[in-house]
Amino acid sequence: MGTKLERIAEISATSRKPEFTSLYHLINADLLKECHKELDGNIADLVQRLKNKSYKPLPTRRVYIPKANGKLRPLGIVSYEDKIVQLAVKKILEAIYEPRFLNCMYGFRPKRGCHEAVKEVYQHVSHGKINFIVDADIKGFFDHIDHEWMMKFLEWHIKDPNILWLIRKYLKAGVMVDGIYEDTEEGTVQGGNISPTLANIYMHNVLTLWFKLIIQKEARGECFLVNYADDFVAGFQYKSDAEHYYAALKDRMAKFNLELEESKSRLIEFGRYAEQNRKARGLGKPETFDFLGFTFYYGKSRKGYPWPKVKTSRKKFEKKLKEFKEWLYDNKNQPARNIVKQLNVKLVGYYRYYGVSFNIYKLNAFLHRVQQFLFKAMNRRGCRRTYTWNGFVDMLKCYPLAKPKVYCSLY
C-alpha cells in the first residue's frame, strides 16, 4: 500500500496537471489496518502523556453562529485528541452524577429530552394546583460558569486529584478567536463533549438541588421546577411563594456568578382561574409562557372549560419558516421530484419535534406556508412562469408533501 501511495505522490509532484481517475479501491483492508495501527500508536502516546501529566489540551477554536434574535452564539471547535479525552471524562462524570441528578433535569441526559421536559411541565399545569409561573432566563449561562465554584462542586464527590487536575486544564485551556489566543477565566466552551455535563453539574448545585431543599420545603402550597440545560420554568400554587422564589432566585444566581436576563424573566398568573381573575381586574387575556420552543396557553376543553394547551412559539414558527423559504429559493432549480423529496425530509423533522398534542393546527399552518413558498420558488426558475396554481396542485398529487402528525402525546 505504501508503494502505491508513494507513486501517487510522485505523479502529483512531477506532473503539471495531474488527474487521478481510480482511487476509491485504495481504501481496502490493508490501508484500514495501517490506519488502525497508527490510531493505536496515537492512543498509546496519549495515554502515556496523561499518565505523566505532560498532556495539555489545545485552545478551542471559537466560531460564532447566528441566533434567532440576530445575536451570535459562540461555539467551540475542539481538537480530535481532546474530544477523545473529554468523552472519557464525560463518561466518568456521568457514572457519578447521573444517579444524583434530580428527575426534574432533562438536558443532555440519557433517555431524556425536550419532549419529556415539555410533557412534565404540561402535566403539572394541567393536573396540579398551579396558578403562577416564573419564567426566567439566565444571561449567557455557559459563558459565566464560575471555575472555582465548579471545582468546589466537583470536589464534594471527587477526591481523585488527577481527574480534578484534568478538568481544570480543560476549563483553563483558552480559546483561539481569529487566530488570537484568549484566556478562559470563566465559562465552559460550548462544543466540547464535557461542556454539557459540567453545565448540568453546575445547574444541579445552583438551581435544582436548592429548589428541592429550600424552595419546596418553605412553600405553603404546591410547586414544581423543570430544567433543560439553561432553560427552566417553575410553577406555584400561591403568588406569595412565586414572589419569594423569584426574589431569592436573583440572589442565588448572583452568588454563583450568574445573572437573570430581566427582559426575558417574569412572574405571570397562569391557571384555570387566570382568565376570570384578570377579567375582574379589567386586564386582557391571560398571559402565556414559552419553554423549549413551545408556547403554553389556556384555551377551552371540548366541554368549554379552561384547559392548558401547547403550540409552536411564534418566534420558532417564524424562524423555521425563514429557513425553509431560504432553502427552497436556493434549491429551486432542481427537478420537482428532488425538491419535494428533500423538502419532505425537512418537514418530517419539523413535525417530529413540534408534533405534540394540541399543536396540529399550527403544523397545518406551517405546511400551508411552506406550500406557498414552494409554489413561488418553482415559478422563479426562469423568465417564464413554470406552474399555474392548478398545475402546481397536480404536481403535488404526483409528489405529495408530507402531512403533519402528532408524534408526542402530552397526556
What are these regions (language model features)?
Residues 172, 260-334:
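A conserved non-catalytic segment of reverse transcriptases
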Residues 86-87, 91-106:
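Electropositive, glycine- and tryptophan-enriched low-complexity nucleic-acid-binding patches
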Residues 1-41:
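Non-catalytic, polymerase-adjacent accessory regions of viral genome-replication enzymes
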Residues 370-373, 378, 382-411:
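Extended C-terminal regions of large enzymes
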Residues 2-3, 15, 81-90, 122, ...:
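Duplex nucleic acid-engaging cores and interfaces of nucleic-acid transaction enzymes
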Residues 224-228, 265-273, 342-346, 363-371, ...:
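A glycine-rich phosphate-binding loop feature that marks nucleotide/adenosyl-phosphate handling sites
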Residues 49-63, 68, 100-105, 109-112, ...:
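Conserved polymerase palm-domain catalytic core
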Residues 285, 326-386:
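Right-hand nucleic-acid polymerase module
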